[in-house]
Amino acid sequence: MLAAEVAGLGNYGMRGTRHSVGMEVLDRLARQLAVAEGWRVDKRCCADVALATAHGLELVLLKPRRFMNLNGLSVASAAEIYSLGPGDIYLVHDDLDKALGKVAIKLGGSARGHNGVQSCISALQSNEMTRLRIGIGRPEGDVTVPNYVLSPFSAGEREKLDQILAQAVTCLLEHIQSRAPAEPGDRG
């Protein structure tokens, strides 16, 4: 069976912040794939890990237990443990350059200033990973980017978040399905 790693990037212990929205997507994905009770700490990669199956692919769901700028160490360790290459990895992360609620798949490329993605590129020595970018928008007024991404979603944003997480999971699963092997009898 083919496999993929899906890593929700974020700051461990900072649940509910904009910068950790990738981890919230992973929680939602685990619930949808009926493995929400399957999370376990894997000390080998310093992450919470759950195993799931979707569209014929075995998925390694990963939430690093590190700060964002060290997430790549967990992602790379898990890839080694499960014998996965950079092209088998999905990085789910926040994106300042997309408006709140905008979700998009990006195939490889630069980190575009995202420290978690840069950590993964450095640790894996590759930029081939597929990214699921979750728009969080830019700060308004004189709020600095670090303060903005490390702060919780506002009450108004939180109201929209459930729909955003659902949209993100759908987008991710559709992309995973596009990679899955064809069922016998399918003509493509």
Label every model-predicted segment:
Residues A104-S110, Y148-F153:
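Short glycine-enriched, charge-decorated loop/helix-capping segments at active-site entrances
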Residues M1-G108, Q118, S122-L132, P139-T144, ...:
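Nucleotide and nucleotide-moiety/phosphate-recognizing core
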